[in-house]
Amino acid sequence: MSTLLNRLTLLVSFAFSALCLQAADKKPFGLMTDLIEHTGQTWQNGYASNLPVWQLEEAIEPLQYAAIRSSHPAFSWIVPGETGGTRQTAYRVIVADNREDAASGRGNLWDSGVVGSDRSVAVRYAGEALKPGKSYFWRVKTVTNTEGESEWSEVKAFRTADRLSEYETAYYPQVKTMEFPVGITEIRPGTRLVDFGKDAFGQLVLTLASDGTRDSVVVHLGECLEGGRILRDPGKSTIRYHRYPLALLKGTHTYRIKIGKDKRNTGSAAVLMPAYVGEVVPFRYCEIEGYEAPLTPASVVRETVHYPFDETASSFRCSNDTLNQIWELCKYSVRATSFSGIYVDGDRERI
């Protein structure tokens, strides 16, 4: 009897899930404002925060978000439909200055009405100019040639910048990802070479222990190896190398390596890093010299700085390993170098 009940429960669960998925497919999804998808998300110093953008005033510490900089932004969405050849024939967009009205299907700022059109990209807001530094809410429903009228989409929130123009490109804040070594090698007693596997712009965070007999270590950061050690003198090339002495406190402590100023990329014409991120340097390898205690991957962290990047948005795989490696190199290069623009090398394009 219990087995039968379990099976019935499982069948009901599957049926409910299928209905939910079917219902979800009938709503427009993938809503974007000025081509930014995650407009309701906030970040704190590079890491995602749990506070939604419409509760920004409740934050004690500064938060970052993808500010919409246009007084008349454009809305985009993905048209729902399970049938091949599904085409949108009409849409209706509403915009409200509060979540409750939007959730109830009321656009107290703008209601486009039913517009006969197949357009689902860059539908421009046509209400009164939005105000700076405020949160807004919108949603859309569509009519298609195969499914008829859809349900309302989920409510999408966005927040405007402190200064607005008729049109200005919106963008995400820079974010951080914690990365751990793929290998730690003891070069000689007291000296370890840490390899993060790939080069990246970032900062180094170390958790080290000292019994008080050793008061300092030396940290080397670099992009290239020579003879199994980090290349100390890359000459006039754009390969980077940095050396940082680190004084140790007695006990176990976490240290953030302060990146030194480089005259080549911190001049008056340089693209400066935002204060909530701090300075970064490109490196793949780290050498820790003069440290006798055990060193684990968890105690050496690279905080990689990059523009938000969806690893699942594209993929490629074929029978040719060389082509696969070229694809991965190109994909990683976009992620690693696009936080302030597309770079030819480590630092040249931000000078």
Model regions and ranges:
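Hydrophobic h-region of N-terminal signal peptides that target proteins for export
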Residues: 13-22
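Active-site core of glycosidic bond-cleaving carbohydrate-active enzymes
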Residues: 351
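Bacterial N-terminal signal peptides that target proteins for export
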Residues: 1-12
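Extracellular/oxidizing-compartment recognition motifs
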Residues: 24-348
